[in-house]
Amino acid sequence: MLVGVTGHRPERLGTNWPVVERWIGDKINEYKKTGESVSLITGMARGVDQIAARVAVKKGVGVHCYFPFKHNMTDFEKSIVERAETTRFEYDKYVPQCYIDRDRRIVDDCDVLLVVWDGVKTGGTYYTYKYALDNGKKVEVLQIPVAGSDLNDRRI
């Protein structure tokens, strides 16, 4: 089972990191219980993508890193790529559509998409979520409040 992930960057997560980390870990455990092999597809952006990558490595789950374009990697990115089953770059350099194309590839390649979303209907997380729904993908959502408020674990 290929599990894609999308969600907000740190600025929109606020103090919700621990709940996000726990939820992703719980979902990975749930999928592992089916007996299927489980791997995570992450876009490796700061925030939810990197939280998910770290959780997957801790849980012994394969990781597929889908970067929007080639760049100088951070130490964290290098540490995940070293363990990754695959690493791909949508483009050799930045182009305006690189993030959208990377996000669509994650959706196209995954069996289920985990979405950490604050409910605001703009931005990359929302458009990736909508693309998944429009293309009949199974989607699981952890709705978080807008950054700065407390997290109530609400599902949409």
Question: What are these model-predicted stretches?
Answer:
Residues 1-154:
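Acidic/glycine-enriched connector segments
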